[in-house]
Amino acid sequence: MTRPTMTGTLPADPQRRHWLRAGLTTAAVAALAPVAGSAAAAAPSAAADTAIDVLRLDLNESSYGPSPKVGPAVQRALVEAPRYVSAAQLQALQVQIATLEGVAPEQVIVGEVLEALGQHLALSEGAGGFIYSVPGYGALVDAARPFGGRAVEVPLNARLENDLPALLATIAPDTRALFVVNPHNPSGTLSPGADFDRFVSAAQARTLVIVDEAYLDYREDAAALSAVRLLRQGQNVVVFRTLGKIHALAGLQVGYALAPTGLAGALRQRGVGGAHAQNQLSLAAAAAALADTVHVAQVRRSVALERQRWQQVLTGLGLRSTEAAGNFVFVDTGRPHAAVAAGLLQQGVRIARVFAPYDTWVRITIGTPAENRRAQQALGHVLA
């Protein structure tokens, strides 16, 4: 597969993850009804965007739905909706996550972590640099800006991967953190395990390393690749996870971070991740989703199969693409993004925004087989 070579200083990704702070309506709870046992048989997540039925393949949401255990769990949690989340309830989820990840419960922070972490570092450490790859997801960096944080942008390498040597070389005495998304978004590329381990180990000796692993669950070998292994060794590393991707809880915006004990404690002293910042329904959904490893495995297999089919279609169209590891493809159409996106929208398919300077590349979320066929046909029509 032909690989592109591009350089340049690129803008940050303005998208954000925000945590659910209010209760859900009965209609919203009904939307969490159990899905079919097989992920492939689950209902698609198309939405009426305009007058036509538009496929939302723009935000890397899961079309396969949450675990069938989530709906009943949320229904049961409605009984507790009049009550604030207690410390004991939050601790139960922290213990569940800690057991799953092999860390201590006090290292688990549930709630708005990336943005709050960026703000905390800027406020507590003083003005300084926050290094990250561009184009990319820059929520943490953007959150630090109003408090003296300075974005230090490092372009992707020729294979559209995080440029590990360049990121490492950019660390300076005033660097407050190095933020890396692996697999990367929007390219989907995965930094190799051994190389990434060496990179993190070297970087964390000089600054805090924050690894966003939002898409790592789509890999069968996620546990062997996760930077959590380095955190367990006592390294200066924070790992962020969201349940908005493979667990299909984007509408609840549930996630957590795993951090060194000292940093986790400092964040809690600032009120980050406390019981008051949670809600009954999100906690119930998270606990149920994390417990259903069978559903996660089904979704992983389904997405992997559909990713292969997408690559076959793209090859057939004569297009080059990255070896994306998440639930999306990143492909060079050879045409302006705006024209392709507008053409696809006319065909009822919404894709992600442009990621400059890759102005001819498009990111398309992998949906259900039916959704993907529709998107592939639309892409072929637009490029004909």
Where are the regions that the model predicts?
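Conserved PLP-binding catalytic core of the aspartate aminotransferase-like
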Residues: 156, 303-304, 313-347
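Active-site pre-lysine segment of PLP-dependent enzymes
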Residues: 99, 164-173, 189-209, 213-246
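PLP-dependent enzyme catalytic core of the Aspartate aminotransferase-like
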Residues: 343-347, 355-384
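PLP-dependent aminotransferase class I/II
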Residues: 67, 236-316, 320-322
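N-terminal secretory signal peptides and thylakoid transit peptides that target proteins
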Residues: 3-28
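PLP-dependent aminotransferase-like
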Residues: 123-180
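N-terminal small-domain helix-loop-helix segment of the aminotransferase-like
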Residues: 38-115, 120
